């Protein structure tokens, strides 16, 4: 089986071969090395990411294992509480989602009944979800005529003498709990259908949940240490045997991985006496170091490991940065060379445990030299980029694209006096993330050619992006940028499915869309009802000149890095949900998707196989390559 996987990896340059590889990855993790000997763990969830970073046909497959793990993700953002908006109808009043809907009803009734309003002003009322307690309060204030009566009881003729009583329809709604509707007119009332929504847009628009990007960039320097984890092959899969740091110690243990990790953590704790956060700098660490340590992470050690972050029981944090994501695809030695340090080879990963044990002294020496080179290169690069991209600091970002684009957006927006804001709370962050679709939308299954947008950068740099804090609006204003919670109805006739939904049997569903995606969907025949939106009154002007100025500055510093960065930006604009410019990514991806749809409009739908926001699969039998298609590159 290993031979079969090795052959597949060498020829993994087409869709069919990669799909066969995926089948193996459902059962095994592939142990591989790159040309510098850096270990790489390939599993089903990260193969796409790895293929975007490197040519996997050049990797050396060492083995297969089931004794490993994926990165342990941070605890998921809790789902926001489901929400029902307030409905004030002539026949009834339904309060918005609340822990105390009865209190909301009595306050609403006080708008019409001055004696209730006076009692509330003079005495107040404690929150309660008990009808009997509300009635007790009303009676004590001489307002028993407004007592609350359940609709079912009223229909039993028990309370007809109380003509002014407050009749409420009681119900239990899934994922929300008890809810009450005040029935104003018994003759015309019928229980309404109330939309249960995933977000409260009014809440999300609150000023305190948004902050100016520039305010988050002014951070003091945090201590940085270069680190590398080395693993050997055993009968039970890969095993970490050495953790090297610079400046710092090297930890080696062939008998107990637990003790190896505990010694490393004790050392980390000792050097954190004057700071609550430090940065560990690795190279391709997300592909080997971190997942390998995660497999063996000891319980009850005082630290939890989540993705690239270590969090101690007392709140201290260690952030594991991957310098490779700032290298624009350079090998470790090329990265060190281009940033002025002496390139040193590093020990090979995934060697036999016996070989590692026999050569441990030379491996320690080789590791220290390599880490010293990485540390010096990283310090030089971070210093240079922080000058060019001020006030952005390298350790605040997970990849160079984020840092570069944040710098450009901040510079352009500040120069025009309009800053871009970002959400500081999980719920608005989740709302923005929900508006992004990176999935492929399947149209027809057929043999196809793959096309990609020639330059994502050209498309997104000429567009507008939100500036300032958002405002809540019930419906977005044409010509303004907004993100709306929408009820979407699929066209009844044959259509290209431009709005992603994971249930093909549903013709109406609720989702989050940008104003750009709404325009695209309406062009495609969808019916869109907006259920509330975040709208921005101001826009950041086009970014093209700011992008070109920044590219030139970096090019003067390091031409190789700039050329590679420009290539990455042209080909990709991938959403990063931890980015403070998530709003930019949201609209950038929508603009790309609108561009893809404009091309699909020129093609007979029978020839379209699938598409994403930047790629389009067209039937191999399609020959009419029109002018629109010339803006795509065939892969």
Curated annotation (Swiss-Prot):
Protein location: Virion membrane; Host endosome
Major subcellular site: virion
Induction pattern: Expressed in the early phase of the viral replicative cycle.
GO cellular component, one term: host cell endosome
Assigned keywords, A-Z: Early protein, Host endosome, Host-virus interaction, Membrane, Microtubular outwards viral transport, Viral release from host cell, Virion, Virulence
Gene Ontology terms describing biological process: microtubule-dependent intracellular transport of viral material towards cell periphery
Pfam family, one: Pox_F12L
Function: Plays a role in intracellular enveloped virus (IEV) transport to the cell surface through microtubule transport. Together with protein OPG064/E2, forms a complex that interacts with host KLC2 (kinesin light chain isoform 2) to engage the kinesin-1 complex and thereby promote IEV trafficking.
Family of this protein: Belongs to the orthopoxvirus OPG056 family.
Subunit record text: Interacts with protein OPG164/A36. Interacts with protein OPG064/E2.
Protein name: Protein OPG056
Organism classification: Viruses, Varidnaviria, Bamfordvirae, Nucleocytoviricota, Pokkesviricetes
